[in-house]
Amino acid sequence: IEQGKFGAHPYSDVFYRLGRLAAQEYIDADIFDDVDYLVPIPLHPRRMHERGFNQAEEICKGMSDVLHIPVDTQHLVRVRNNPHQSRSEFQRRKDNVKDLFEIRYPEEWKNKHIVLVDDVITSGATMMACMRKMTPIRGCRIGVFALGWAHK
């Protein structure tokens, strides 16, 4: 995953394929049966321009092709460009994600089941920042999916 994001030649197709593989593992389980949208953790436009792709969005696309669940990239937006989290300490991660995201048109997620998707969960601070913005939406159920987790 790290090489796909930060290597000399970042490669979006790796994340798409990993998303398909992950979805194929869960296709017979019922965990995605009532999901309305797969929502990738968004990148700031500057980081998106630098990398050329959003790895979480590529994972979502792969999952969507297998599970037939739409990908929503319009409602959850990153409004601040924070430093890379991968090598930060826990408290710094929590501080880095404050007011990092906004929900546009939250009423459209009312009574929906949303699954947030990212490549790796380390401290959970990014996912928690997104969920904090989503919890006021009436009837919105939130799930979380990541390809992996990092630990020390």
Model-predicted segments: where are they?
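Active-site-facing substrate-recognition patch
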Residues: I1-Y37, H44-D65, D72-H113, S123, ...
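Basic, glycine-rich
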Residues: V120
